Amino acid sequence: MKYVSRSACEMRGALGGVIKEVELLSSLEHPFLVNLWFSFQDEEDLFMVCDLLTGGDLRYHLQNRVEFSEQSVALLVCELGSALEYLQAHRVVHRDIKPDNILLDDTGHAHLTDFNIATRLQKNSLACSMSGTKPYMAPEVFLCALDEVAGYSYPVDWWSLGVVAYEMRGNIRPFVVHSNTPLAEIKNILNTPVHYPRYWSSNFVDLLQKLLSTYPGARISTRQELHQTPMLRNIDFQMVLEKKIKPIYKPPEDHLNCDPCLELEEMIVESRPLHKKKKRLAKQRSAQRDSDPETALVKEFIVYNRYKELKRKAMEQKEHDWQRELELAMANSIVNSLTPIQEKPVASTVHDDDCVTAPSAAAQLKGGIIEFIDRTPSPQIKESASSTLNIPTRPFHK
């Protein structure tokens, strides 16, 4: 669960970014993203409940000097490449791909998180703000900041993925760039050739070179282009999506895959620790009993429930399937002709003078219009053996 202080966000002017992140995550779902399940708020904080991933972030494992093989790096590139292609289909640029924002599950599969500075592009538009972490930012982002290009697009995330892949294999980054490095100097650094150790395979180097191309048009930016590289030519991406390819590196299960100091800091240093929130809010609400609690909430922060969303989507799919079945049934049912109604003559023993018969259909058709056809059966009257009507009479008296 991720939670942020409303007051701290308002002081830093970051409240809009949190609201935007929740709106963005509520529209996304992918096997290699950290998916949002719930979002809610109280008087103090904004909460986001996401997938539980116990493997820790990639930065933690790099700091612990985990040696990732080329095969391990290649699988991570495939998994995150699938996530990037999904984001591109939804017009989303992440803009902050780095080891800190890549979480591992208990089996070692990678998941992308932290969409705080992500943006959704309009059709045929470019992003132009300088957003991200400098050591992982693509050359065109810096060129845009120097007003040398109009903007940048989805390939910036693939550059960042290439930097992460290089760092996983060599435990150093391909370029020496820091947060305080001037833009002009960064431009020169990124134009220098990248050094690849001799013991790295040619196929692995080829993959990194295509991810770290300084020209966005020549850079790998799709899953198909990944599949065309010699390193990943034999990878079954459908099995990758279904997580059927087992990662070589599995995070340890005997301890927390994170720095325990960070967990203790929240309990000791934090002025408003989460574990004391219930008691604290009870006092506040008691003191503000006469005020409207709704006025203390951020109206723009959406309340999201993925369970309800999945139920709604399932119902929509059922309705769509029913509609399609109905349309197919109607399209396949062809009426060749209509059989006219045949009237059967009704035998009657009543004299013609005693009843009025309805005109036949044929007679009505001669007139051009059938106004009404009476199909009520004629009354059946039983006759006596002598075929005479036995009507009782009474004597007539003058």
PLM features: what roles do these ranges have?
Residues Y3-L28:
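Conserved N-lobe beta3->alphaC-helix segment of eukaryotic protein kinase catalytic domains
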Residues S39:
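Activation-segment/catalytic-loop signature of the eukaryotic protein kinase fold
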Residues E44-D57, H61:
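Conserved short submotifs of the Hanks-type protein kinase catalytic core
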Residues L76-V77:
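Activation segment signature within eukaryotic-like protein kinase domains
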Residues S213-I220, Q224-I245:
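Terminal C-lobe "cap" of eukaryotic-type protein kinase domains
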Residues P247-K398:
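Eukaryotic Ser/Thr kinase distal regulatory-tail detector
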